[in-house]
């Protein structure tokens, strides 16, 4: 059974991101567009809570149900919400195209109801040596976010 979800991002960065997963055993395809980004890399993560009552700050930390360190999307040791970076050319829109085998739209670890956050700076993928590298990827301010909601198939 295919599951689809959508996230409307608001803030200084704005856009729409779509999620699709064919079954609980297949990767999630993430696609969409974001505007309002400076040229360069921007951290792109799923955060724990679907709470935007205090803007992006109330979305909590990266979604990390297994207590792992921050890492790159290809790392075994990573938060489930670590989706790496999206690259802005300076023109609007910035395309989002990610396939990830760790996140899911099924079961207890589903990202539906959680928040996508776009960050001001590049995610160092846990390898930057900064005090925040192993928790946030030192990706800077939260400049756009939105709650992931279930979408019509």
UniProtKB/Swiss-Prot annotation:
Keyword tags: Antioxidant, Copper, Cytoplasm, Disulfide bond, Metal-binding, Oxidoreductase, Zinc
Cofactor(s) this protein cannot do without: Cu cation; Zn(2+)
Recorded GO CC terms: peroxisome
The protein's Enzyme Commission number: 1.15.1.1
Cysteine-cysteine disulfides: 56-145
Entry's localization field: Cytoplasm
Any matching Pfam family: Sod_Cu
Assembly description: Homodimer.
Known role: Destroys radicals which are normally produced within the cells and which are toxic to biological systems.
UniProt binding sites for Zn(2+): 62, 70, 79, 82
Record-listed Cu cation binding positions: 45, 47, 62, 119
Origin species: Drosophila yakuba (Fruit fly)
Free-text remark on how the cofactor is bound: Binds 1 copper ion per subunit. Binds 1 zinc ion per subunit.
GO terms of biological process kind: determination of adult lifespan; positive regulation of mitophagy; regulation of synaptic plasticity
Similarity-based family: Belongs to the Cu-Zn superoxide dismutase family.
Protein name: Superoxide dismutase [Cu-Zn]
């Amino acid at each position: 059974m295919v599951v689809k979800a959508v996230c409307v991002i608001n803030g200084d960065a704005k856009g729409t991101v779509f999620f699709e997963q064919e079954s609980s055993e297949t990767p999630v395809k993430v696609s969409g567009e974001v505007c309002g980004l400076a040229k360069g890399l921007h951290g792109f993560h799923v955060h724990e809570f679907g709470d935007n009552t205090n803007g992006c700050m109330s979305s909590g930390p990266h979604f990390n149900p297994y207590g792992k360190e921050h890492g790159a999307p290809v790392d075994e040791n990573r938060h489930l919400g670590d989706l790496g970076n999206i690259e802005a050319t300076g023109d609007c829109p910035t395309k989002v195209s990610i396939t990830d085998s760790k996140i899911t739209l099924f079961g207890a670890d589903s990202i539906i109801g959680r928040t996508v956050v776009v960050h001001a700076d590049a995610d160092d993928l846990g390898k930057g040596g900064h005090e925040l590298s192993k928790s946030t990827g030192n990706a800077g301010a939260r400049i756009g976010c939105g709650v992931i909601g279930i979408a019509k198939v």
